[in-house]
Amino acid sequence: MPVINLEIKSRMPYAGGQSFGEVGAYEQVDGMVHFGVDPDSLANETISDIRLAPKDGQGKVGFSSDFRVLVPVDQSKGNRRLFLDILNRGKYSAAKDMNSSATFVPDAPPDPGNGFLMRQGYSVAWCGWQHDVPEISGIMGIRVPDAATTQGPISGKVVVTFQFNTPTASQLLSDRNHRSYPADDLDDPNAIMTVQEHEDAPEEIIPRDQWSFARVEEETVVPDSQYAYLASGFQPGKVYQVIYTTTGAPVSGLGLLAIRDFGSFLRYGSTDEGNPCAGNIDHSYVSGVS
């Protein structure tokens, strides 16, 4: 089985031991699930660059994901169904809507809301699958290896586009504080920044000496490979683009295997393998919202 170890870090009463109708109380299980997958399996062949990922002594590609599972304390009262909620940027999505729960709060247990899923007896699970989510406690992600060739790590060009609503001096080279691809060389003369008046307007190249890889911190410009800084400031409405070289190619498609294989493990894995749902799932439902 692709799940090689379920590392449980905590078990606690869910929602302070709240009882959900005839099903009763739930338990919350948190931890890390470790995978080892065969890169040559037909079931995995559509994952881009999986054969370029490093392998262990058994020829498997390893990676790991954060997970959380909610199960009835008395699983005989459950409905023998699993609801696997696909995280959106590491945050709960579908289950929140199903339960009419409060807005996601990092590092806080999922709000039970009206308890719909629990009152129906569902086991509910989440598994990190995006490698670039912010490293914030409570946001679930996945740790994947970088692809590499016989010549070593993979380098290539990255294009980052951004547009602002307010004047800004520096910008992280990613969206919504996700992990960025850092520039290889802060002084790379071949790095390019362009600006457009709007999306369909012609691009104008901004002279290299007018911008840099840096961030503004307490009114001081600090060199930083993960930020772009423009001396004159980024203007609202205009479209900016940075093209630069980076090294490191995470095999991000492994996140899709994490969802597939964690869901399968919860349905078919045994008690001896550490499965908190062992023997209590007949049907699985997978849903996500973006």
Question: What is each residue range found by the language model?
Answer:
Residues 1-289:
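C-terminal His-loop and adjacent cap/lid subdomain of alpha/beta-hydrolase
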